[in-house]
């Protein structure tokens, strides 16, 4: 743990570096806002052990003191119609990636893979500079029906991997492991964009003849891709499965791809309940899925 030259608190953990921005303190007295000096400080409790705290300047102890973190940036992102963000990720350089769905035909695009809404809801993927002052790229992804981006992750090269659901039989694909729409109500999709957002590294349908969604994704240090979701299909494209068959109405599904998009495994994960779905995924020394289950007593 350390305090850098900007006054930010920097904590190194096994999962990476966590930075807490220098705090800002204020009081409002008789309608006037007064800035109060505030900073992080470190104290050594025992040899090798440090404790972080706050050092606050003189203030009126009879009035409320507000201590806030610094807002790095905050911005609108959207067009003239319905825009919703569902997923966010940050890369090693601090660039921010956002995905979701939009019906706007004037959604802001820059450096795009696609610059026009196809129909209804399209997926959007946008990348911001670390300060939020520059929209590095922003693109639509979609076919002739509704498409939604639920989650994304970013690899070490700055490639965004997006997962979601598509109702479009012509969702854009490239080097797919499943080239055709599986049928049924909807399919999941998994799409990897180039670092500048202008090209598809790979993009594939993921689903069978029922309803399929991919809801979460993670990338390991060497670029392997892990995704999870749910499926009502009895013919979901399994490969080297832990569980080969759907055991309920909707089962969770999990899959792993190489950095180039080739499948390593795909499996059901579920019981006999009405609905199972993966809702979160992380990769460290082990692969961890979290999900939900609905069962009938």
Description of each model-found segment:
Residues 47, 53, 60-297:
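A sequence-level/structural motif corresponding to short, flexible coil/turn segments enriched
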Residues 1-80, 87-90:
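Residues that cap or anchor secondary-structure elements
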């Amino acid at each position: 743990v350390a305090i850098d030259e900007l006054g930010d608190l920097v904590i190194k953990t096994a999962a990476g570096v966590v930075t807490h921005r220098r705090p800002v303190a204020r009081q409002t007295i008789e309608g006037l806002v007064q800035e109060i000096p505030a900073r992080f400080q470190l104290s050594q409790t025992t040899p090798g052990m440090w404790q972080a705290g706050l050092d606050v300047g003189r203030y009126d102890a009879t009035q409320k003191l507000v201590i806030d973190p610094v807002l790095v940036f905050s911005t609108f992102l959207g067009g003239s119609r319905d825009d919703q963000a569902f997923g966010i990720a940050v890369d090693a350089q601090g660039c921010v990636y956002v995905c979701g769905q939009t019906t706007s035909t004037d959604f802001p695009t820059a450096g795009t893979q696609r610059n026009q809404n196809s129909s209804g809801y399209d997926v959007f993927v946008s990348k911001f500079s670390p300060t939020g002052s520059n929209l590095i790229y922003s693109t639509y992804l979609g076919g002739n029906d509704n498409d939604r981006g639920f989650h994304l992750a970013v690899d070490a090269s700055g490639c965004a991997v997006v997962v979601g659901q598509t109702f479009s039989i012509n969702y854009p694909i490239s080097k797919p492991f499943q080239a055709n729409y599986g049928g049924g109500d909807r399919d999941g999709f998994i799409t990897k964009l180039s670092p500048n957002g202008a090209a598809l590294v790979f993009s594939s349908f993921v689903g069978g003849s029922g309803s399929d969604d991919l809801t979460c994704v993670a990338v390991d240090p060497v670029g392997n891709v892990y995704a999870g979701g749910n499926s009502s299909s009895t013919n979901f494209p399994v490969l080297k499965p832990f569980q080969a068959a759907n055991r309920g109405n909707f089962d969770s599904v999990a899959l792993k791809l190489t950095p180039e998009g080739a499948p390593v495994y795909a499996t059901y994960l579920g019981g006999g309940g009405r609905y199972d779905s993966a809702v979160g995924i992380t990769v460290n020394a082990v692969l961890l899925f979290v999900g939900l289950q609905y069962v009938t007593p």
